[in-house]
From Swiss-Prot:
It comes from Eremothecium gossypii (strain ATCC 10895 / CBS 109.51 / FGSC 9923 / NRRL Y-1056). It is found in: Cytoplasm. The lineage of its organism: Eukaryota, Fungi, Dikarya, Ascomycota, Saccharomycotina. CDD domains: Arginase (cd09989). Its EC number is 3.5.3.1. Pfam families: Arginase (PF00491). This is Arginase. Belongs to the arginase family. Mn(2+) 2 binds at residues 216, 218, 322, 324.
Length: 399
């Protein structure tokens, strides 16, 4: 989560094979393990992998899980390969697009426009073309969260804007919860990643045993004691798990905090604070960094992640997808880009594979920020990627 505290643009090509970590320490290149056997016709994917080799920080680390099993020993029972996307929890194929134009979990403006741009790019029509009946929910309409943020000076302990975040995420929680209980698949468009406090808790109200795939460059599990920035988009997982509840500001006291460590798995991590690493280890949380994607390949990583949170392969799974999990070559208009990320195809494969299991019950797509684009093409690239994530999760295939 380190770059939640300091946005860097090292991905622009600064430096000769070295990048700076969260605290300024030089991080060197790391050999890739699986790429020689992996053929790609896309030159940009190959270039992204070279950037990954040069720019990804950190050591090999481990895959942390609640039962201490090695990653390679994970079984994938109940998950057949080569299936078509299907949705056993939503045979009627009804979904709710929940608009969450909220930026109060961090300091930059523009991310509140993400949902508007995703819709303008044709996300709704694309999903309807896949056979889904769509309704649009706007739980934040009529509230002046963005205007209030411009005037906000509230800090409780280290937490910035806890009242804004608490109120907005509660409204989002209620909308997602209602959609899930009505038999609709909630697809929430953010907004910054603090909105997941509302989305995940809303889904867990309907599916208390659901597993959560958190696809992100950052772990977002800082507590109010460990966060350096105070930005709550770097803390949603700690709230969802009920960590250090005694320190929570009153506006966030409504959060149930029922997510169990054994029910979350990360994919795509590459910028994690030291305190977050300790939390992951202490709680035994399954976490796959870009090292593991490089070593095992994305297919095996996804299978291991799904097996960790859904051992028998039959339970519900939700996906909370921060677009910065994908390398900024493909997703430049986002608030905390970190080079060395997933290729576009790797990023889409994750949700394609979840769709094939039939277990998807909810999706978040967050952190598209058109205002941070250097030019219009960056906006198009980022927004099109966000739309592709949603379409692939809801059944779009290459063949």
């Amino acid at each position: 989560m380190a770059q939640r505290n300091c946005w860097r643009r090292s991905w622009l090509g600064v430096g000769g094979g070295l990048c700076l970590g969260a605290h300024g320490a030089a991080r060197g290149p790391r050999q890739l393990f699986h790429l020689t056997a992996k053929q790609s016709s896309a030159a940009s994917d190959a270039k992204c992998r070279r950037w990954r080799a040069a720019g990804r920080g950190g050591g090999a680390g481990g895959v942390y899980n609640g039962r201490g099993a090695a990653a390679g020993s994970r079984q994938t029972s109940g998950m057949a390969h080569n299936e078509h996307p299907h949705y056993k929890f939503f045979e009627s194929k009804k979904a709710s697009l929940v608009m969450a134009p909220f930026s109060g979990g961090q300091g930059k403006s523009g991310v509140e426009d993400g949902p508007k741009y995703l819709l303008k790019q044709g996300l709704r029509e694309g999903v309807e073309g896949l056979g889904w009946e769509i309704e649009v929910q706007r739980p934040l309409d009529g509230h002046d969260f963005e205007e209030r943020k411009q005037r906000a000076t509230e800090v409780v302990g280290r937490a910035k804007n806890p009242t804004l975040v608490g109120e907005a995420t509660h409204l989002i929680h209620d909308a997602v919860r209602a959609a899930a209980h009505a038999g609709r698949l909630p697809v929430t468009l953010g907004g910054d990643h603090s909105i997941a406090i509302g989305t995940v808790s809303g889904v867990l109200d309907r599916y208390p045993d659901a597993g959560l795939l958190w696809v992100d460059a950052h772990a977002d599990i800082n507590t109010l004691a460990s966060t350096e920035s105070g930005n709550l988009h770097g803390c949603p997982v700690s709230f969802l798990m009920g960590l250090e509840r005694e320190s929570w500001p009153a506006p966030l006291a409504w959060v149930p905090g029922t997510l169990r460590p054994s029910k979350i798995a990360y994919i795509g991590l590459r910028d994690v604070d030291p305190e977050e690493k300790e939390i992951l280890r202490r709680l035994g949380i399954t976490a796959f960094s870009m090292y593991h994607v490089d070593r095992y390949g994305i297919n095996k990583v996804v299978e291991m992640a799904l097996a960790a949170i859904n051992p028998d392969g039959t339970g519900p799974v939700m996906v909370s997808y921060d677009v910065d999990a994908i390398d900024p070559m493909y997703v430049p208009a986002t608030g905390t880009p970190v080079r060395g990320g997933l290729t576009l195809r790797e990023g889409l494969f994750i949700v394609e594979r979840v769709a094939e299991t039939g277990n998807l019950v909810a999706l978040d797509v967050v952190e598209c920020n058109p205002e941070l684009a250097a030019h219009d093409l960056h906006v198009v690239d980022t927004v099109q990627t966000g739309c592709s994530i949603a379409r692939c999760a809801l059944g779009e295939t290459l063949l």
